[in-house]
């Protein structure tokens, strides 16, 4: 059985004590062990600050971006191996595994291109320079400079490749060294990516470290120049924000947490139309892709009451065609949940929703999955819960069931009512709207906008749209309230978290000489 090791201080270190065992969630067979016991976390952080930070800050954006491009190519060269690991350790179908691994490559490549566009500069100018007085020589310019600490990334179990890449790409391009902590249950993919990067000798010493096993006191060791980016539950995010050192040192923290994402069908959309079929396709995909274990997955399906029955029947038909089982089989469309804990949480969540609504498809009951021994694996069927009144429901607006579970909520067709229902989620990463009615869209978009980081406007004429569940590196990822209040990616916007914005005030020629030529 494989032993995963941490990569800290530019060497591989095996943890001691009693390790955690990583399983195949479809068969429950043990695959690997991981432990962080005995790893000197303070020394790992100091090494990143002392060696990785100065080396990265000495490079231009173009040079940093070139390294990201090389990492993307290295991962792509090992694509099939990584897909196999994602199937075995993550319970992903091959299609789901591609969604993760190819998403990592695409994000790294996007930030490599951004680095090339930013060119020879090492600092990021923020807006145009300002004349501060009667004389044009009295000048001001806002500038982003890399922070001199270390970026600690605590990633979720559901996207071990993309989660690693999307955080590391922005930090490294900004000029900050990274210590990446993958979720232990699915860490084999991130561990192998780290091996690939180390073997290829792409990055300067100290620029990238990996900690496997328990994070232990890692967040408690951060100081004023460090940053912490966390993806996971809202409860854990709140505990991290409340750490004494985080409060005392004003450690910069980004949290991407729970989200009750909604998909709203406009009153103008007729059953059988192209828009209607797109809506069904997006909802069905978000319920079943990665067994619903996506932070961006549609959880609340809000439809006009007049066609709620038809939508329910059509979704039931689509979900009934989904074969659940061992994702190593070609005929399986949906694999298991990642861990026994996730399965228990999902079952409890389904039971809570079903206590208020009605199970239209699936249940929390044990499932006979294809290609696995009876009683093995962390499987649950796709679940659709139908509610009689969208606005009156409570649990559906309060509890995210992190699995292949969605709730169907009727509304009158009025945009204001749809906005009120969606807003009950108390902040989300993304919600989607499907309508050709411009007036309805105007009210709906700007009604739900304050509650979201992204709004997806579904339309059948958008070719190759990946749907609302896909996070694109060019657009921000995050959201207010329940979603954590954070923001990642968004092209150059993603660099701001890792940089200090400083206002330079003085003689224009002096400031111009300090900054040098800037990208146009």
Question: Over which residues does each language-model region extend?
Answer:
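Hydrophobic packing residues within well-ordered alpha-helices of enzyme cores
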Residues: 108, 190-193, 221, 240, ...
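Rossmann-like NAD(P) dinucleotide-binding subdomain of oxidoreductase/dehydrogenase enzymes
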Residues: 120-278, 309, 412, 486
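Residue-level signal for inorganic ion chemistry
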Residues: 28, 64, 86, 175, ...
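Conserved C-terminal structural/oligomerization subdomain of aldehyde/semialdehyde dehydrogenase
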Residues: 26-33, 202-205, 224-227, 306, ...
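ALDH superfamily catalytic-core signature
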Residues: 199-201, 225-227, 235-392, 414-420, ...
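Residues at or immediately preceding the N-termini of alpha-helices
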Residues: 25, 41, 61, 272-276, ...
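N-terminal Rossmann-like NAD(P)+-binding subdomain of aldehyde/semialdehyde dehydrogenases
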Residues: 1-136, 321, 338, 347
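Short, well-ordered beta-strand elements within core beta-sheets of diverse protein domains
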Residues: 30-37, 53-57, 132, 152-153, ...
